[in-house]
């Protein structure tokens, strides 16, 4: 227990850093403006509709002037009364504040990351860090097929913005900033016509700040959850008084007493000890998997529900968290359908007198491309009809031939790159066929020619354009397989960067 106080103790060296003065610095909003340019969109412009105009300091100065005025931060209890602080342009000012806050509130977290790199090597080894998202791929290849039970959990989002503020206040020790943050959050939330929309509304709405709030909430949840998971086998039969000292962990001790019945860590140790429990998170979902009986999975399920309910005031129904057997369940994971299948392997055993066959059953991971959702997305993007028959793109006939081909080839390569981890390529070949024929029909429509005549004129040149760069990469990685079509799985580490369109493939990949 000697090392536990060091872990639970808050970073005292930075709790007196004041962020409130930074809100009135024009340079902060200039940084936010530069970030907006990198995302091809920003709100700090003369016209909030025309995003091609130059950056304007006039709007920022006007906003800072209003924030300096004492009475303009008072929000009327009557929703119909106009807020004098935000005024008629409250949507624009809210977006500007959102971009500025996003830069400011990330400062304490950035300092923590930089300070961790300055520690000695032994301190870094002891620091509680989470694994990279790239560890998902070795988990799928090395661990997934050896597991028996799996639970696919949707991480609940905070239904009230005050929960996000309470989570943030443990790291930002500036009351003035938090008060202004609370005012801004409630006003920004009320600016939407339907305030009860899902948190993904903010994540997809070009709001870096709300993305940061959601990530900080998830980080706090995981830091608690994984700490108990990683330290469960090290708990000793000692008092749990030190364990309750961290306000970050126990905001509501009375409620958490109901979760952890008793005051001895032996109860927690026997409750959570499991060396075969695996936890993986991606986007707003997580996976719990175990090799043992479903009884332990059921215990972890109720622990998660109690943690969300009593610590984060988030209601989650235990009945909606299902525990599935991997052999009978297909997991929708990162744009793949993944399951574990039994493959029989027959071995002939020959002795001097007898010969007999040994049938061994082996578990094998199977990852397939979800063909129906992809065809549906292609249909909505007007590459094919609802049945998967390729159609032309009339909106592209004004472009040059090279631009049309380049766009279709880029989409095809992105799909091949992302779904290269599929163990069955047949569905992927069908998607490539749809894109290739849609490209040919678009070119034929532009030149007012038939598809057959256009293909005859081009010959194999168009087919060579659709050959992806995977062939070149495989020739370097697998020289022996370069002469034939390689059908194995290949996981590229950059595919999480394009997972915005996972589950809705008509996103950025079909609009590039």
From Swiss-Prot:
Keywords: Chloroplast, mRNA processing, Plastid, RNA-binding, tRNA processing. GO terms for molecular function: RNA binding. GO terms for cellular component: chloroplast. One of its GO terms (biological process) is tRNA processing. It comes from the Eukaryota. It is found in: Plastid, Chloroplast. Its main location: plastid. It holds the Pfam family Intron_maturas2. Belongs to the intron maturase 2 family. MatK subfamily. PANTHER family: MATURASE K. Usually encoded in the trnK tRNA gene intron. Probably assists in splicing its own and other chloroplast group II introns. This is Maturase K.
């Amino acid at each position: 227990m000697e090392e536990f106080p060091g872990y639970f103790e808050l970073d005292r060296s930075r709790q007196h850093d004041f962020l409130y003065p930074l809100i009135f610095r024009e340079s902060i909003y200039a940084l936010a403006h530069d970030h907006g340019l990198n995302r091809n969109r920003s709100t700090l412009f003369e016209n909030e509709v025309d995003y091609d105009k130059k950056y304007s300091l006039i709007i920022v100065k006007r906003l800072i002037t209003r924030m300096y005025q004492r009475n303009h931060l008072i929000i009327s209890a009557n929703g119909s009364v106009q807020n004098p602080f935000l005024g008629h342009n409250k949507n624009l000012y809210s977006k500007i504040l959102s971009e500025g806050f996003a830069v400011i509130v990330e400062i304490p977290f950035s300092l923590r990351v930089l300070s961790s790199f300055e520690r000695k090597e032994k301190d870094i080894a002891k620091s509680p860090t989470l694994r990279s998202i790239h560890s998902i791929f070795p988990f799928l290849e090395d661990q997934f097929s050896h597991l028996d039970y799996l639970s696919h959990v949707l991480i609940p989002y905070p239904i009230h913005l005050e929960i996000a503020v309470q989570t943030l206040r443990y790291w930002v020790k500036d009351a003035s900033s938090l008060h202004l943050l609370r005012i801004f959050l409630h006003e920004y939330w009320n600016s939407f016509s339907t305030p009860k929309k899902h948190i993904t509304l903010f994540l997809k709405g070009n709001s870096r700040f709300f993305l940061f709030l959601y990530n900080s909430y998830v980080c706090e949840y995981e830091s608690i959850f994984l700490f108990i998971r990683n330290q469960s086998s090290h708990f000793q039969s000692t008092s749990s008084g030190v364990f309750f000292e961290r306000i970050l962990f126990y905001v509501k001790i009375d409620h958490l007493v109901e979760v952890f019945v008793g005051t001895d860590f032996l109860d927690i140790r026997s409750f959570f000890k499991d060396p075969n429990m695996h936890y993986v998170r991606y986007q707003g979902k997580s996976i719990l998997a175990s090799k043992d009986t479903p009884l332990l999975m059921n215990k972890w399920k109720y622990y998660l529900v109690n943690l969300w309910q009593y610590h984060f005031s988030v209601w989650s129904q235990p009945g909606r968290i299902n525990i599935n057997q991997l052999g009978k369940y297909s997991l929708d994971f990162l744009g793949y359908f993944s399951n574990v299948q039994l493959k029989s392997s027959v071995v002939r055993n020959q002795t001097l007198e007898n010969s007999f066959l040994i049938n061994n059953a082996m578990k094998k991971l199977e990852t397939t491309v979800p063909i129906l959702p992809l065809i549906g997305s292609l249909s909505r993007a007007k590459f094919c009809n609802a049945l998967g028959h390729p159609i032309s793109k009339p909106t592209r006939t004004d472009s040059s031939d090279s631009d049309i081909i380049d766009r279709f080839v880029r989409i095809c390569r992105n799909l091949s790159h992302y779904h290269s981890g599929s163990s069955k390529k047949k569905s992927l070949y069908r998607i490539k066929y749809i894109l290739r024929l849609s490209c040919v029909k678009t070119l034929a429509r532009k030149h007012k020619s038939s598809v057959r005549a256009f293909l005859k004129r081009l010959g194999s040149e168009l087919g060579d354009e659709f050959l992806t760069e995977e062939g070149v990469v495989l020739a370097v990685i697998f020289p022996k397989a370069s002469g034939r079509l390689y059908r194995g799985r290949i996981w590229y580490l950059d595919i999480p960067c394009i997972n915005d369109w996972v589950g809705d493939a008509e996103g950025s990949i079909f609009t590039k």
